[in-house]
UniProtKB/Swiss-Prot annotation:
GO terms for molecular function: glutaminase activity; imidazoleglycerol-phosphate synthase activity; lyase activity. This is Imidazole glycerol phosphate synthase subunit HisH. CDD domains: GATase1_IGP_Synthase. The keyword rRNA-binding does not apply. The gene is hisH. Pathway: Amino-acid biosynthesis; L-histidine biosynthesis; L-histidine from 5-phospho-alpha-D-ribose 1-diphosphate: step 5/9.
Amino acid sequence: MIVIIDYDTGNTKSISKALDFIGLQNKISSDATEISQADGVILPGVGAYPEAMKELTRRGLDKTLKEIAATGKPILGVCLGMQLLLESSNEHSFTSGLGLIPGHVEKLPEEPEFAVPHMGWNQLQIKRATPLTKQLDGEYVYYVHSYYANCPEEYIIATSGYSIEVPGMINNGNIYGAQFHPEKSGQIGLEILKGFKEVTYSCKSSQQ
């Protein structure tokens, strides 16, 4: 069972429908106990970093996510959810994050030929093969964001070219993040979610 975390700042239903489509049993929940009992967790997110982190903390879900990460169960952060996995953000003001992947969230550079927000389809360049990125080099995914993950190169598994080389996907052990929206990226997005399904089943089998 995959639990999609509901903390009033994410597009939970579209992610749930995408998981339904690939046959991955899932549930939307804000209950810490249900989330802790999941085989894997997806942290969605849209909106502003400070408000999202504040809401996670208010519900006690920041601690829940850190506890789940420590068990080795897979976590996938999507869009703002990916950014929350990092150590901090300077969006509006300095805000501490979950600290599950080293790095900081910064605003995309504004240049005449590159609009902010970065919105639309962009091509993935795979930097490191993982179950989520295999055979996806050169494929297109859908982005909507104004901030990006500035993190050490060893944690970046896929990028897209823009005003800078945007980290499209990041990874630290059992923790994964996608800056783009897999649930809005057609068949390629479904392949990424299938990769998360594979990681989840593999982890569950190893822990039994």
